[in-house]
Amino acid sequence: MKINKYMFLPALIALGMASCNGEGDGNVQMWEWETPEAPVEVDPYVEKGWTNVTKDYGEMPEYIRVYSSPAKLQDKDVKAFIAVADATKAKFDVLGGAEGYHTPSEFYTADAAPIIINGGFFYDGSSLSLVWRNGELVCPNVQVDSPDWSETWYYMPRGVFAKKADGSFEVGWTWTDLQDHTYWYPPPMPLENGRKPDASYPAGAKDFQAVTAIGGGPVLVKGNEIINSYEDEYLLINPTGNRPRTAIGYNSTDHKLVLFVCEGDGMTSGIAGMTLEDVANVMKDLGCDETCNLDGGGSSCMLVNGKETIKPSDGSQRSVVNGVAIK
């Protein structure tokens, strides 16, 4: 018998229907798909042993987080905190000015910024560190210092942490002449009796241009390299001793501002503080390729929504001349 190909068509259709449904009722079987798990956010600071304690301090903008340190840093028992802010969203501000005392809590009462730390150095109610606000000089880094105030005079540029017009941050050294012209130097200037910095010395000098800046020193990390410039900056702040410290840094890769404080002077049993080298190493480990030290010792303080993180080593908050706020 001659076979016609169309003779098999009904059988093939029936077989196909049966293969789609074991009962042959014409319903297509629905397969269950696994719902992919949402990606887990990796917190680089938690991975390094820090603890996210933001919720302990109340409501906070989503672009600011607060962390407490692991029990040990640099092989020392420590109590430290960092506030980390998205630099593309947060506002960096300098509080205070050339003179006048304020505790950090008084700054908070006036400003209510989520994060406040102490700022630069001061003496007798006057700032010794640069304050630069809205693109203008408020007060300079101290222009001259001396070990004897008679025969030896050091005109030393000191460290500055600055926000630039493009929104990035950088550390460097500044010096202001008697005409209030401020110069920016990429390297520090070696101490030399009577030698003044100017528009061409040290090398790479240029007019200082920034939106906002706070002075302090010494510079701890620049260009992702740890810097030892406290001698060139003539900062006699016990750099190799364990003390309370305050610093501010910038991670240019992730666009993060990192504000650091550590407790010291035995306010908590067994907690002496950290050296400048310790702080530099910690900040670099946290990803900061630019970091400047600020005033430390009894001045060191960080407020989160007005609440203290470390215990000030004076027993209570020291009155300071300026501070830094993140909003």
Task: Locate the predicted segments by residue.
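A short, polar/proline- and glycine-enriched secondary-structure boundary/capping micro-motif
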Residues: 103-106, 180-186, 239, 268-274
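Conserved, well-ordered active-site substructure
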Residues: 126-151, 229-290, 299-327
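Zymogen propeptides
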Residues: 22-178
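Active-site-adjacent helix-turn-beta-strand microarchitecture at beta-sheet edges
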Residues: 126-231, 237-239
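Short glycine-rich loop/turn motifs
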Residues: 77-82, 158, 215-217, 243-247, ...
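C-terminal motif of bacterial Sec signal peptides marking the signal peptidase cleavage site
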Residues: 16-19
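Bacterial N-terminal signal peptides that target proteins for export
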Residues: 1-8
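Structural recognition of the beta-strand scaffold that forms the well-ordered cores
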Residues: 83-84, 114-118, 160-162, 170-172, ...
